[in-house]
Amino acid sequence: MRAIRPFKYFPYSRREDEITVEQTNESKLYVTGTYVGGQYGKMIWNLVNGTDDIRYVGLIRGAELNINGQIVKVPDYLFGRAFGDVYYLLGMSTYMTNPADVPLYTLSVYNNETIGFVFALPPKTTVHVPEYGFIGLINYNAKLIEVKPKELGTYVIIYSPEEYMIYYEEIGQNLGILPTVYMVNSYNVEAGYTGYGFHERVILKIPKSWLNFAVDLTRLLGKI
């Protein structure tokens, strides 16, 4: 995990950020980046939906950075994948439970195997999304991948405590011990290529029959 995070990470957005949405006359679905830089290495991702329909997308990006005179390549991987559990457990993100209501930086389960942000782009709009951590940027790669919300499910997610410890180290704050196992309701989205893969978590989908049994058992015990 550490190998794909060689640059300092900060929360994906900051309080002073204003997320802006504007109309576009474009006809395609694509992304560009506007590098602001500064102390925190700010990048603004411009997510363009020039089509006539709402599009659900993930963002895959990578970078080449100059870290203390050394050139470091960050492989292309899914935005939200590296620290998604921490974002959720700290209350910075939620999981998608309704495709009609997808706030910015909403997480979702991808292909029943990992997590990442899903962006719902209205037709004929450009959404400007800030991200931080691109300090010493030389160049970057970015692409949108279309995803399809398939089914709402209940998942148990297990991740390494290294994730939040690295995050705390990078932001210079200790926000306390986080649970390394949690249960969440989330849509599973179907996607093709999701970028560089790393084994950062285990995702277990709970069968509906188990949930129904738990509900029935609770009702039965309540009658005793």
Swiss-Prot record:
This is Uncharacterized protein ORF224. It comes from Acidianus filamentous virus 1 (isolate United States/Yellowstone).
